[in-house]
């Protein structure tokens, strides 16, 4: 158990799975660059249809709907994760939902030719559904096929796929590439290509061995896949751990979303999962990128859009750094460092934004704070919330937990997007103080409540939470900090 061998089949399976993460990142960032061009399309199409120019209110509302409907689709999709993975399996679910990506991409890609605003909005809704499902499927699949000793590092690749997707969308959105009046439908429709690639490659990836053994009782097939993925014949301990979990599952009733909040042994991990997802979206990362172009412009950067892409490069670099740190430092430690660093940078950004009109050099301080803020985000709050949810739950409750956590992430993302412009209007630069307060709250919560899962099997983590519940029923203090000090499973293959 806990092999650290990295095999070609394992890397291939994880790489193909993270195409779904890339799709999420790409479709999150792709709508920003061609904003003015798409508004012109909306204006022209509506004017042709009604023979009168649309009001500015209608135009703004339709643009806002085109952006926000993606998050609405994501909320619905993320909450539907369990319906797919329990019925079709992890790999087959990823394969099936690519039909949504192709359908959404076609609608957006052909909306200009058809002169249809409805096709654009419907395409964004469908692609949101697809991305919402991917945010559940990908971390779950990666977590279940990865060796315990490498689960965190490989789990971080989900976030790497997301940030690469955002970066590619920013680059493709440049006016010299696809961000033009003629080519913007190709920019939106590009999502079809990764979907086709993933459809072609997924049949060569194995199904999750945990799903095969625990859900389907196919022990020999699961054993064969584990041996091929991990490059070792000695998987007896892992198979036994899965069989033990399978036996426990057969004695329990099916775990629903409501059961996650009702059952004492699930309540604490689901609250931790939700809080970690909120710590990602309420950290202010989207606000920083919203402000960045204007700040770079004020600092005298000739092409602020390229500076924003530079911030995206920093985003990507530090996600790679996190891949190598997460199994050394641990999830909890990196999350605390990330939240603390972001809180400091958030205060620094507030001060520099308030003083930059009086002191020109303050703009450069603000740029530095932005880049460091982004770096701290990708060390902790960026990657960790996505994959730690899969670690906190056993096979039975995991799909429902991923659905709840994913839905809370998408919902908070939607609310931040909805409320942030108004907050900025009333608070100005002080809006970052609000995010600082959130960051401090999440830091305190993480310090006292979030356990370290590095090097521990799913069974060990689940039993640790059950131990807290049993201890708590005897009127004693729950050993959440003891859980942080449990030694990882020793590598018997080393």
From Swiss-Prot:
One of its GO terms (cellular component) is cell projection. It is a multi-pass membrane protein. Glycans are attached at residue 43. It catalyses: D-glucose(out) = D-glucose(in); D-galactose(in) = D-galactose(out). Residues 473-494 are annotated as: Disordered. The chain crosses the membrane at residues 11-32, 65-85, 91-111, 119-142, 154-174, 184-204, 270-290, 305-325, 332-352, 364-389, 400-420, 430-450. It is found in: Cell membrane; Perikaryon; Cell projection. The modification Phosphoserine is found at residue 485. Residues 33-64, 112-118, 175-183, 291-304, 353-363, 421-429 are extracellular. Keywords: Cell membrane, Cell projection, Glycoprotein, Membrane, Phosphoprotein, Sugar transport, Transmembrane, Transmembrane helix, Transport. The modification Phosphothreonine is found at residues 232, 492. D-glucose binds at residues 159, 280-281, 286, 315, 378, 386. It holds the Pfam family Sugar_tr. Interacts with SMIM43; the interaction may promote SLC2A3-mediated glucose transport to meet the energy needs of mesendoderm differentiation. Belongs to the major facilitator superfamily. Sugar transporter (TC 2.A.1.1) family. Glucose transporter subfamily. PANTHER family: SOLUTE CARRIER FAMILY 2 (PTHR23503), SOLUTE CARRIER FAMILY 2, FACILITATED GLUCOSE TRANSPORTER MEMBER 3 (PTHR23503:SF99). Transport is mediated via a series of conformation changes, switching between a conformation where the substrate-binding cavity is accessible from the outside, and a another conformation where it is accessible from the cytoplasm. This is Solute carrier family 2, facilitated glucose transporter member 3.
């Amino acid at each position: 158990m806990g092999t650290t061998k990295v095999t070609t089949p394992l890397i291939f399976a994880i790489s193909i799975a993270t195409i779904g993460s890339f799709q999420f990142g790409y479709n999150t960032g792709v709508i920003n660059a061609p904003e003015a061009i798409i508004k012109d399309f909306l204006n022209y199409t509506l004017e042709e249809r009604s023979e009168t120019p649309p009001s500015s209110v209608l135009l703004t509302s339709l643009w806002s709907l085109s952006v926000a409907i993606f998050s609405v689709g994501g909320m619905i999709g993320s909450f539907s994760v369990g319906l797919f993975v329990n019925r079709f399996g992890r790999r087959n679910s990823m394969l099936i939902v690519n039909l949504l990506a192709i359908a959404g991409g076609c609608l957006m890609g052909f909306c200009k030719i058809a002169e249809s605003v409805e096709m654009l909005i419907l395409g964004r809704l469908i692609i949101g559904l697809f991305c919402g499902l991917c945010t559940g499927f990908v971390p779950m699949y990666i977590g279940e096929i990865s060796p315990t000793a490498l689960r965190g590092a490989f789990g971080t690749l989900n976030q790497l796929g997301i940030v690469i997707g955002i970066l590619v969308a920013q680059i493709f959105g440049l006016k010299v590439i696809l961000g033009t009046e003629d080519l913007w439908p190709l920019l939106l429709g590009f999502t079809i290509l990764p979907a086709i690639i993933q459809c072609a490659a997924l049949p060569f990836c194995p199904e999750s061995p945990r799903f095969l053994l625990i859900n389907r009782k196919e022990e020999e097939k699961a054993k064969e896949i584990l041996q091929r993925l991990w490059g070792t014949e000695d998987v007896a301990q892992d198979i036994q751990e899965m069989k033990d979990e399978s036996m426990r599952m057969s004695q329990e009733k099916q775990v629903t979303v409501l059961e996650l909040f009702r059952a004492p042994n699930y309540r604490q991990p689901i609250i931790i999962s939700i809080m970690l997802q909120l710590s990602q979206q309420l950290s202010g990362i989207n606000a920083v990128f919203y402000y960045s172009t204007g700040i770079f412009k004020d600092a005298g950067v000739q092409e602020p859009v390229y500076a924003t892409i530079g911030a995206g490069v920093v985003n990507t670099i530090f996600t790679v750094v996190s891949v190598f740190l997460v199994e050394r430092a641990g999830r909890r430690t990196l999350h605390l460092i990330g939240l603390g660093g972001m809180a400091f940078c958030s205060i620094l950004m507030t001060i520099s934004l308030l003083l930059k009109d009086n002191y020109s050099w303050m703009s450069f301080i603000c740029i530095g704070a932005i880049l460091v803020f982004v770096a701290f985000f990708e060390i902790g709050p960026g990657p960790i919330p996505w994959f730690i949810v899969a670690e906190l739950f056993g096979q039975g409750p995991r799909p429902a937990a991923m659905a709840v956590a994913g839905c809370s992430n998408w919902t908070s993302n939607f609310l931040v997007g909805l409320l942030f412009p108004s907050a900025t209007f009333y608070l100005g630069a002080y809006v970052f103080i609000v995010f600082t307060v959130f960051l401090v709250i999440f830091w305190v919560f993480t310090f006292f409540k979030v356990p370290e899962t590095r090097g521990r099997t799913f069974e060990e983590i689940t039993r640790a939470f059950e131990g807290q519940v049993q201890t708590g029923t005897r009127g004693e203090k729950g050993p959440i900090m003891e859980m942080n000090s449990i030694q990882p499973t020793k590598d018997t293959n080393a």
